[in-house]
Amino acid sequence: MENKSREDINLSPVSKIEIYSFFDPFSSDCFKLSAILSKLRIEYNQYIRIRHILNPSLKVLTKCQAQSTSNFDNIALAYKAAELQGRVRAERFIHLMQNEIIPKRDIITESMICDCIQNAGIDLEVFKDDLQKSKLTESLKIDLHIAREMEIEQAPSLVFFSEDVHEEGLKVEGLYPYHIYTYIINELMGKPIEKNLPPKLETYIQQQQLVTMEELLTIYEWPEKLLNKELKKLAIQQKIEKLKYPDGDFWKSKMPKIKSK
């Protein structure tokens, strides 16, 4: 863990803790961290703001280029184009993409990106137009500048900032247990804070559409036996179905998806 400054990056201060999350879309550790970030967002929503940045390192961008045949199936450019329709939708898009490429070990295709774009509530035609804009490359350069200023060398990496823009941020590289991140948030807030409860299991799966067992265990902290029992109930009610992939079991919602705001 290291202290990093954002004073030279020309970023405006906010009234809550800002967390910069640098991720590699092909990294299983980044995929696992997304469950932890979802839990943080649920429990500490009024205290934190999370900004996801695709780590624009040469290694990551080379992987994005190697997986693509055009701009359309280049996940780095696709993510930046998705961001133009809102960060929440862009984060939803990348979560759906990771659900496709990590557990299934799939190659990225145009049809996969189209499906994830639409499931994230993003206008597909506008997205296609945005993909042709040169400003996407400029946006990646800005992300690269931010990553260099914060000395990001690996993904996942999180950088925590308090509301004082002149204070140094705390950089956390790699993947840690959930309580490490909650400890940092509580220390930065400097006062007792109340946690929110997670939504009903059914609601969460409906929101996410596809979830891992590990993700649900992280969010709800139930005994695995109890969680399996509740999942089977939802499966019997035809609300979810179990999918088996090389990297483990997933649960997919059969309920109408909740539209992104």
Swiss-Prot record:
Pfam families assigned to the protein according to its UniProt record, in alphabetical order: Thioredoxin_5
GO CC annotations, alphabetized: cytoplasm
Cytoplasm in keyword set: yes
Keywords: Cytoplasm
Gene3D superfamilies the UniProt entry points to: Glutaredoxin
Major localization class: cytoplasm
Subcellular location per the Swiss-Prot or TrEMBL entry: Cytoplasm
Keyword Cytoplasm: yes
Quaternary structure and partners: Interacts with Spx.
Family assignment from sequence similarity: Belongs to the SpxH family.
PANTHER family listed in its UniProt record: CLPXP ADAPTER PROTEIN SPXH (PTHR13887:SF47), GLUTATHIONE S-TRANSFERASE KAPPA (PTHR13887)
Function: Adapter protein required for efficient degradation of Spx by ClpXP under non-stress conditions. Interaction with Spx stabilizes Spx and exposes the C-terminus of Spx for recognition and proteolysis by ClpXP.
UniProt protein name: ClpXP adapter protein SpxH
Organism the protein comes from: Staphylococcus aureus
Gene that specifies this protein: spxH
